[in-house]
Amino acid sequence: MNRFLEFSNNFLEVAGNTINNISSKSITDNVGNVWGNITGGRVGQVYDINGRRVTEVKLVAEGGFGFVYLVRDDYNNMYALKRMFIQERERLEAMKNEIDVMQKLRNNPNIVKLEGFKINENRNTRETEVLMLMEYCSGGSVLDIMNARGEFTRLEEREILAIFSDVCNGVLAMHQQQPPIAHRDLKIENVLYCEHSNRYKLCDFGSSTIKTFNTATERGKAEDDINMFTTLFYRAPEMVDLYRGQIIDEKVDVWALGCLLFKMAFYVDPFDGGSLQIINNNYKIPDNSKYSNNFHKLIQFILVADPTQRPSINDLLNYLNEIRGSSRRGLQTFSSNNNNSNNNSNNNSNNNSNNNSVNNSSNSINRPIRTSSSSNSTPNFNSPNTNNNNYNNNNNNSKNYGNTPNSTPPNAKKNIFDILGDDTTSSTSNSNNSPSVSRNNINNNSNNFNNNNNNNNNNNNNNNNNNNNNNNNNTNNNNSNNNNYNNNNNKFDEFESWGNTPLQHPSPSNSNSNVIINNTNSSGKNNQNKSNSGNGNFFDNDFEFEGFVSPTTNGSTNFEVNTTNTNVSLNSSTHSSSSFNNSSNNNNTNNSSVSVGSSINNSGTRLMNNSSGSLPQSRQSSFNSTPQQQQQQFNSSTNSGSYNNLTSSFNNLNISTSSSASISSSGGVSNNSDNSWNVTLTPSQSNKNSTGNLKPLNNNNNNNNNNNNRFANNTNSSRDYSFDFSSPNTSNNNDFGSFVQPSSSSSLNTTHFSKPNYNVNLNQTTSMTNNYNNNNYNNNNNSNNNNNNSKVFDFGIL
């Protein structure tokens, strides 16, 4: 009995001492272990890294030297924590080197970001704990993605090139350091996909070094270092055969990139036979390869046994930039949309500006989770998405091809290789500068395309009282559809197939909902110059205005204008109201306003260019016409027949307060001729009464289409539509020179027009009260205005 009591007292004493020695950290560890046994993982341990407190969420990966955990900070931000226990001094130095490299490359978008680190040395156990807090890449490694795809759904060429491009940019950042840093362990396990940034990133820099080995004198030292820090199947020949006496430097990474590219494509290592196969550079592309010849040539370009002949990382990126083809653009993974763009060459211009609505949603694929020792994340195998980028698309040719093994559908997206350099780089350019490694505006949801080929052979002509000749023979198709883009595209769509057939680049998208004026004509000239000089006179070619003809003796109601002495003023005034965008031919791209006449009063100016301009309300234009009797009204609200002629005639007309014209009318229809224009206002049959005369202009709104385009009819019946028989205004004659020539008398009932200098008051037909930024004035025959509150002029002539 006494022995039992003695044993009990000793037990209680030991237990009490144990309880007193338990620290809070031990309690946390024990609780975490218990909770881990319940949930299947060790969860709950708290770490303090450089003042940042993080808590374990789950175990992500486990390797021979440590573990990778998913952790959460106090602000619910997720990170990857790499925890290692190291006893060898060489391994500890390698970890310190990895931390140093990651700190240098911390801000590179293709390098896994190091958030913090902590090194705890235990002198008693001679073991060192290394903690590295890094950004969490939830997409897993490339190995995880390939395994999840399986044998029969291998990576597509555009996907491989997307991954490869990001990896090359990460390697470029390392090789640009002084001295250059060689990764020396590039493989698919060390490439992670980060879904939040939509990028592939390099990790595991434990093998990286700035050392350069001259194997002739440092053979033994190099051999130990290579065997410890590199993987056999990715080693370059100079690393395998040290007796070659070749220098081992950063070009070993280029060789490893070739092996990585080969394995992503064919799921096998190119040199799985070992050292002898590497030394002989003996690899074979499978006969059943589904990839293009350009892809095979890319592998051959990289895998060069002699390091002195092997390309550098800059050469590799330049080669990628060359073979991509500047006239081909990005692809679409799951849907195809044919987008026609504007190609304005010197001789032919097909203006099919079709902005088609695109909705590309990536397919989600449920795949098993596979972790690797080098991964700091769990894979999420949904196809990565990327949004649109703003760019300038300057192309010469555009073709559309169907789906083939070597091509994939086009997409209204920027090509990924535009990231590598300037977008205007041609397919044959070879820049010595390294391309840009940033992919900007990933979350920008609007695509602004600017398809302008400034290849016009225009003679430099004087705009004042000169006859101008244009060397462009243009054929224009008047098809302009203005729709909205809604893009949600796959990241891999940024790549073309690299096949033997070029792909169509995306069509221009007009994100501005302001005024659209299409300069659509049968044989006009393209005013594409970036300045006001050398554009020629806007009125030197009557075909630019279609129905604008010279004075005639017989014809329908005509605005007859002699443009021989026309003054064209290229004003620099811009306004914050409606914008006149030329979407058909991208003409008048100069940043200046164009108006007829050099004299402008306070009423404002009708502008037409691609800059912002205003259409002021209640403006009066002096047409210098002398009606001898009051004319009946014309109602052009039917939007048909000669009303279309009216709208197309005013495509390029800039009416200022000093514009002038004379009016004559007769029974026939005028023919086109040079140096003048004609506006045919033929009333519809529904607007005539029983006697054949025209009905009064009605005040009802007329629907042009489902978007409820409203005609600018008079809403105030108390105002007069008649001509203003005020004193003749001759001040404008000096502004327009001989802009108006009196036409010979013609008969239509008793109507005669014989002399100028009377004002035509267009106040009632041009008065707009809505917000100009929401208006759309589209003076094109075949224009579909999808913007609300679109207004078309309805001229009531009395």
UniProtKB/Swiss-Prot annotation:
Superkingdom of the source species: Eukaryota
Enzyme class: transferase
Low complexity biased stretches: 335-406, 429-490, 506-538, 557-603, 611-642, 659-678, 698-716, 770-790
Catalysis: reaction(s): L-seryl-[protein] + ATP = O-phospho-L-seryl-[protein] + ADP + H(+); L-threonyl-[protein] + ATP = O-phospho-L-threonyl-[protein] + ADP + H(+)
Residues at the catalytic site: 185 (proton acceptor)
Residues passing through the membrane, by range: none
GO MF terms, alphabetically ordered: ATP binding; protein serine kinase activity; protein serine/threonine kinase activity
InterPro entries: Kinase-like_dom_sf, Prot_kinase_dom, Ser/Thr_kinase_AS
Binding site residues for ATP: 60-68, 82
Record-linked SUPFAM superfamilies: Protein kinase-like (PK-like)
Pfam families per the UniProt record, alphabetical: Pkinase
Domain Protein kinase, residue spans: 54-324
Key words of the record: ATP-binding, Kinase, Nucleotide-binding, Serine/threonine-protein kinase, Transferase
Segments of skewed composition (Polar residues): 679-697, 717-769
GO CC aspect terms: cytoplasm
Keyword ATP-binding: yes
SMART domains, alphabetized: S_TKc
Disulfide bonds: none
Family to which the UniProt record says this protein belongs: Belongs to the protein kinase superfamily. Ser/Thr protein kinase family.
Protein name: Probable serine/threonine-protein kinase DDB_G0276461
